[in-house]
């Protein structure tokens, strides 16, 4: 991954003790007398020091970016798990705020089983909290990284869900504009959840959009040409790229740089793998059509032969959104028992205020996380041992026929769709706690109080200038109609945001262009230059308007007094681990040689590159031109018209950004652990007392084995000793978070090879074996593959 600057702290103290009003707005109140009420009535006791936001107990940070972070949380009243996106509004300019609220308002009107659901919006003066559905299976991107291409039967199950969700957006007159494997999540049952509507916008038949946004490998040719477009056709092209990626494990169009990629997209030539079926090839030809007028519509594509193979009796049809059931008496009775009145429940649901009442009602329609096989505080947020509902939206009597049979073949569980429309089966024996008198957030969310794993991502916010939307109005508040323009000018983002363009998740936008600034990216129908286009990535002003929210794989660069960059490792996401380690140029460790993770690994099962600039999402606004130079190893040449395997590109950083990092980072003094350059929790510091305390602990059981790299019948403790031995032999730093879980770090940040990952010994009850689970936390896929392969091959299990 490319290196990045440290991220500004999201100020979460603003939310202490706020009152939720009927319109969804929050009023900050005094702290006196509030915390006691929450402690008495919440599941957590007062002794539990975990911070809270509203009715949610925060569990851990699962993502972090320039202006936002994402936390896994548990709804206190129902026990359901959610993802909370916390956005620091003070870091966003008015345009960014406008786009942020547009994203929220669009999410409110989308109700589809394969789209991430919004439950609640909490807004204070400085912070916006979006409580959303938690998809525990991670990204399709990461799934492909771990497994390579899908078999067509599995790809079909996923793709039917994707097409259904995108077609639903189109029939709602919403265009996503940033469809890619990174924005497709998987729930616990391996069902698709489309996320990140930061670039989405309303389209109107007869009017054109002209914003160039999206990830370049997924972008339609008309976007590269600077042409205006209706909307849906750019999503259709992106879906074609996604289909190709699912089936082949590689991208149809790729290049060493943006110029080469653009040429290949405009040429429209791509390689058909020998294993791809004729029906799949024919379907691709309906998606990847250079002329947008001749490109197929999703309604037409839903009738395609490949789409419906094996589903002849359940032909894919447009999703019919059932009427929302807001009168489920069973849920209402439970909420009355929690302390809500019938009147306020009916008022909130009838107006869909997306306040704490709406959220509680919606979450009651979901399977309780307390029935999960493993504790939510488990270190692996990708554990598939969790069993959660796919959605609260499907209705057994009202859903489209295709949803009955669209379960992924990789899932061994039946889809669970606890409906908000027909009413879920809620166990009557569950004792729900009463709510506190006011919705409080008695949290002191210090960075050292909530240890979090820093992860690279784009900033969260708006996406450049977009045309006024009749549906969305000009409101800056997602819970109200139009409100007056903000009087206070937002804080100017610091220059350290400039490095955000170096990671794959950063988004830049060529906003709706006037004649004066069209030349910034397209000049006379031609691309001006690669360096000019990528100058947007280095522009702080550009990045303050970005909004992508899977905030992961963060690395920070520090500049020493001598001018040599040092790599700052992020803090560990466990109790009290707030130390960091620095790898100086003198402490660089050699890059591991490349090996395949297992003998069964084929060239198809290769890693996607994450850090390349060309893999980032575009939404670049016209900025002052700058040149950007790139370092790192030269990329190997690839064949023209060939589909490039997703591991063959290399991360490229922008060296002229280093000077921008100095101001923030030179103020920070290294800690004792940083001076030592090694984690305290390495094997050299594991005390015998700790081993005695954990001697009786048992490995976590996993139902699924797709994240396992090796299995063994050896005793788990002996396996851990062998793992530590191999890590030491490969000069890896590591910290033992749990009895059978290690957090590992390897690489030289100066060479962009720093990798962080987890290794966990897990029990595989179905196989009567133990396995070693590898999970990448940050770093490029190639660097992770190198070190993971080397370690896996050296383990003598």
From Swiss-Prot:
List the record's Gene Ontology CC terms alphabetically: cytoplasm; dendrite; plasma membrane
Q: Which residues carry this modification: Phosphothreonine?
A: 211, 602, 617
Q: Which organism is it from?
A: Rattus norvegicus (Rat)
> So what does this one do?
Serine/threonine-protein kinase. Involved in the specific phosphorylation of microtubule-associated proteins for MAP2 and MAP4. Phosphorylates the microtubule-associated protein MAPT/TAU. Phosphorylates CDC25C on 'Ser-216'. Regulates localization and activity of some histone deacetylases by mediating phosphorylation of HDAC7, promoting subsequent interaction between HDAC7 and 14-3-3 and export from the nucleus. Regulates localization and activity of MITF by mediating its phosphorylation, promoting subsequent interaction between MITF and 14-3-3 and retention in the cytosol.
Q: What is the lineage of its organism?
A: Eukaryota, Metazoa, Chordata, Craniata, Vertebrata
The record's listing under CDD domains reads: MARK1-3_C, STKc_MARK, UBA_MARK3_4
For the modification Phosphoserine, which residues carry it?
Answer: 42, 368, 374, 376, 380, 383, 400, 419, 469, 593, 596, 636, 651, 654, 687
Describe regulators of its activity. Activated by phosphorylation on Thr-211. Inhibited by phosphorylation on Thr-617.
| Residue intervals of the UBA domain | 326-365
The name on file for this protein is MAP/microtubule affinity-regulating kinase 3
């Amino acid at each position: 991954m490319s290196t990045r600057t440290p991220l500004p702290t999201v100020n979460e103290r603003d939310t202490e003790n706020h009152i939720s009003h009927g319109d969804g707005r929050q009023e900050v109140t005094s702290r006196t007398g509030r915390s006691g009420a929450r402690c008495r009535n919440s599941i957590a006791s007062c002794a539990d020091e975990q911070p809270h936001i509203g009715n949610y107990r925060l569990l851990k940070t699962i993502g972090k970016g320039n202006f936002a972070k994402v936390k896994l949380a548990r709804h206190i009243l129902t026990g359901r798990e959610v993802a909370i996106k916390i956005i620091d509004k003070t870091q966003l300019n008015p345009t960014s705020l406008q786009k942020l609220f547009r994203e929220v308002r669009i999410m409110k009107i989308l109700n589809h089983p394969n789209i991430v659901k919004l439950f609640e919006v909490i807004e204070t003066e400085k912070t916006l909290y979006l409580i959303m559905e938690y998809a525990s299976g991670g990204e399709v991107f990461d799934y492909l990284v771990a497994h390579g291409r899908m078999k067509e039967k599995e790809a079909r199950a996923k793709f039917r869900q994707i097409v259904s969700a995108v077609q639903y957006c189109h029939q709602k007159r919403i265009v996503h504009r940033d469809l890619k494997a990174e924005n497709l999540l998987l729930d616990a049952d391996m069902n698709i959840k489309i996320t990140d509507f930061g670039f989405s916008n309303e389209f109107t038949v007869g009017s054109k959009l002209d914003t160039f946004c999206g990830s370049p490998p997924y972008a339609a040719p008309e976007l590269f040409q600077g042409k205006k477009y209706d909307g849906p056709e750019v999503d259709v092209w992106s879906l074609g790229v996604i289909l190709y990626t699912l089936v082949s494990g590689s991208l149809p169009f790729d290049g060493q740089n943006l110029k080469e990629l653009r040429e290949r997209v405009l040429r429209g030539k791509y390689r058909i793998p020998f294993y791809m079926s004729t029906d799949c090839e024919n379907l691709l030809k309906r998606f990847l059509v250079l002329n947008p007028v001749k490109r197929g519509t999703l309604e037409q594509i839903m009738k395609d032969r490949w789409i419906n193979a094996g589903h002849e009796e359940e032909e894919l049809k447009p999703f019919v959104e059932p009427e929302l059931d807001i009168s489920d008496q069973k849920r209402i009775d439970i909420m009355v028992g929690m302390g809500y009145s019938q009147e306020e429940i009916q008022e909130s649901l009838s107006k869909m205020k997306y306040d704490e009442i709406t959220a509680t009602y919606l979450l009651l329609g979901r399977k309780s996380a307390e029935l999960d096989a493993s504790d939510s505080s488990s270190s692996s947020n990708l554990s598939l041992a969790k069993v959660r509902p796919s959605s609260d939206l499907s209705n057994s009597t009202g859903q489209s026929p295709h949803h009955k049979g669209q379960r992924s073949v990789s899932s061994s569980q039946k889809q669970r769709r606890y409906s908000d429309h027909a009413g879920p089966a809620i166990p009557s024996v569950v004792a729900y706690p009463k709510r506190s008198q006011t919705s409080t957030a008695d949290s002191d969310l210090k960075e050292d109080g909530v240890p979090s794993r820093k992860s690279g991502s784009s900033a969260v916010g708006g996406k450049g200038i977009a045309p006024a939307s009749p549906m969305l109005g000009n409101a800056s508040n997602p819970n109200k109609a139009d409100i007056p323009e903000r009087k206070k000018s937002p804080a100017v983002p610091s220059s350290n945001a400039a490095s955000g363009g170096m990671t794959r998740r950063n988004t830049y936008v060529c906003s709706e262009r006037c004649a004066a600034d069209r030349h910034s990216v397209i000049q006379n129908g031609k691309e001006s230059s690669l360096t000019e286009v990528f100058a947007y990535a280095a522009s702080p002003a550009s990045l303050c308007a970005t909004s992508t929210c899977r905030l992961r794989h963060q690395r920070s660069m520090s500049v020493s007094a001598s001018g040599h960059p040092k790599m700052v490792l992020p803090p560990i996401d466990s109790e009290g681990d707030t130390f960091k380690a620095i790898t100086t140029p003198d402490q660089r460790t050699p890059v591991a040689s490349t090996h395949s993770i297992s003998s069964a690994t084929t060239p198809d099962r290769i890693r996607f590159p994450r850090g390349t600039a060309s893999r980032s999402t575009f939404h670049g606004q016209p900025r002052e031109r700058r040149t950007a130079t790139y370092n790192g190893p030269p990329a190997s040449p690839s064949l023209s018209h060939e589909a490039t395997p997703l591991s063959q590109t290399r991360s490229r950083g922008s060296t002229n950004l280093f000077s921008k990092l100095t101001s923030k980072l030179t103020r920070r003094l290294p800690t004792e652990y940083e001076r030592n350059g090694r984690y305290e929790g390495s094997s050299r510091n594991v005390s015998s007392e700790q081993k005695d305390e954990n001697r009786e602990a048992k490995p976590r059981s996993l139902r699924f084995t797709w994240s396992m790299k090796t299995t063994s019948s050896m005793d788990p403790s002996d396996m851990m000793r062998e793992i530590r031995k191999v890590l030491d032999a490969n000069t890896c730093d590591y910290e033992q978070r749990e009895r059978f879980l290690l957090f590992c770090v390897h690489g030289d940040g100066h060479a962009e090879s720093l990798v962080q990952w987890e290794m966990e010994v897990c029990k595989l009850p179905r196989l009567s074996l133990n396995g070693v689970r590898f999970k990448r936390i940050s770093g490029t896929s190639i660097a992770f593959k190198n070190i993971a392969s080397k370690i896996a091959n050296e383990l003598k299990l």
